[in-house]
């Protein structure tokens, strides 16, 4: 017999007949239903199916993780390429700035040197203001005249350079700017030839007479005829006496043979207002005649730190010097 705890739903109860008529005992046979017999194998198959699904899910997750990893690797490679390009651009920019930096020279690196240069410039300006020039030596600068530099206020007749030139028709062409163009090979061998007027006064006929040397104390656009007639020949001096560093006859040679001091004299005589500030610069760089003829505007602006207007004027005078027309108006 089956226990009472067994469920009647899970089993099949069958009555067993007895052959004893006097016995009232009833026998039953219990059998398990067929559907419950195969129940346990079904549970095992379901578990195996769940395991396969879990493995498939894990594989999918791993595949997605691999895809994400590959994408991150590609992104890192692209970032490295971008960094290399950015660094290349930065190096190119730095090299460009270094190659095109403004070369103003040494004026900005030393306060004492700048102060010294300013004082020298102020002194030169004062010297230029105290002297007058018979004509303008630059196509852009007006003629500057001295109002009154003489201690006496008496009216004095003007002295014309043309009369002086007519008195010496065979004078060296470099002595006057009003004559025709002159080639440097046509210069005379003597810088200073005294000219004696009818009253006995001597006037220097040097090349600095018409070139406006600021330190020449014997050249004026106006002067007193009484004082000139009373002055002895030894009183009037050559304008180059203060320039003791100039070799005799050096300015009359071909420009390619000029020394540094001859080039300095050329700057002073050609355009004192514009070119005299370059005297110290030319001396420090030891620019002689050959170097002067090779100067260009780029060299003056970038390497020597010369201002644009001054560089243009100097290149203009150098071109005229090459053509033999430097002293032509």
Swiss-Prot record:
Modified residues (Phosphoserine): 138, 238
Annotated region (Disordered), positions in chain: 138-157
Tagged with keyword tRNA processing: no
GO molecular function list: chromatin binding; histone binding
Stored SUPFAM superfamilies: SAM/Pointed domain
GO cellular component terms given for this protein: nucleus
Domain SAM intervals: 258-325
Presence of keyword Phosphoprotein: yes
Keywords: Nucleus, Phosphoprotein, Repressor, Transcription, Transcription regulation
Predominant localisation class: nucleus
The organism's place on the tree of life at top rank: Eukaryota
Pfam families: SAM_1 (PF00536)
Subcellular location: Nucleus
GO biological process, one term: negative regulation of DNA-templated transcription
Family from the record: Belongs to the SCM family.
Described function: Putative Polycomb group (PcG) protein. PcG proteins act by forming multiprotein complexes, which are required to maintain the transcriptionally repressive state of homeotic genes throughout development. May be involved in spermatogenesis during sexual maturation.
PANTHER family reported in the protein's UniProt record: BEN DOMAIN-CONTAINING PROTEIN 2, SAM DOMAIN-CONTAINING PROTEIN
Name of the protein in its database record: Sex comb on midleg-like protein 1
Provenance organism: Gorilla gorilla gorilla
Species lineage: Eukaryota, Metazoa, Chordata, Craniata, Vertebrata
């Amino acid at each position: 017999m089956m226990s009472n705890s067994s469920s009647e739903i899970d089993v099949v109860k069958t009555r067993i007949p007895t052959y004893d008529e006097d016995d009232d005992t009833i026998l039953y046979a219990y059998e398990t239903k067929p559907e419950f017999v195969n129940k346990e194998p079904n549970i095992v198959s379901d578990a195996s199916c769940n395991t396969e699904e879990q493995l498939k899910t894990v594989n999918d997750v791993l595949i997605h993780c691999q895809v994400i990893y590959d994408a991150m690797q590609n992104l890192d490679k692209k970032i490295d390429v971008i960094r290399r390009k950015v660094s290349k651009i930065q190096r190119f920019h730095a090299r460009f700035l270094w190659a095109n930096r403004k070369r103003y020279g040494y004026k900005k690196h030393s306060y004492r040197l700048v102060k010294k240069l300013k004082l020298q410039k102020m002194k030169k300006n004062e010297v230029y203001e105290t002297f007058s020039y018979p004509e303008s030596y630059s196509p852009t600068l007006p003629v500057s005249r001295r109002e009154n530099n003489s201690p006496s206020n008496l009216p004095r007749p003007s002295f014309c350079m043309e009369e002086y030139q007519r008195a010496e028709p065979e004078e060296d062409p470099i002595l006057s700017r009003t004559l025709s163009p002159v080639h440097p090979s046509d210069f005379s061998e003597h810088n200073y030839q005294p000219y004696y007027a009818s009253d006995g006064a001597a006037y220097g006929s040097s090349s600095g007479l018409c070139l406006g040397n600021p330190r020449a104390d014997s050249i004026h656009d106006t002067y007193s005829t009484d004082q000139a007639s009373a002055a002895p020949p030894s009183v009037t001096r050559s304008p180059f006496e203060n320039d003791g560093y100039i070799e005799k006859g050096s300015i009359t040679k071909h420009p390619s043979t000029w020394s540094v001091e001859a080039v300095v004299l050329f700057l002073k005589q050609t355009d004192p207002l514009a070119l005299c500030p370059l005297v110290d610069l030319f001396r420090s760089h030891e620019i002689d005649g050959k170097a002067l003829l090779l100067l260009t505007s780029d060299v003056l602006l970038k390497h020597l730190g010369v201002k644009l207007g001054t560089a243009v004027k100097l290149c203009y005078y150098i071109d005229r010097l090459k053509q033999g027309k430097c002293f032509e108006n």
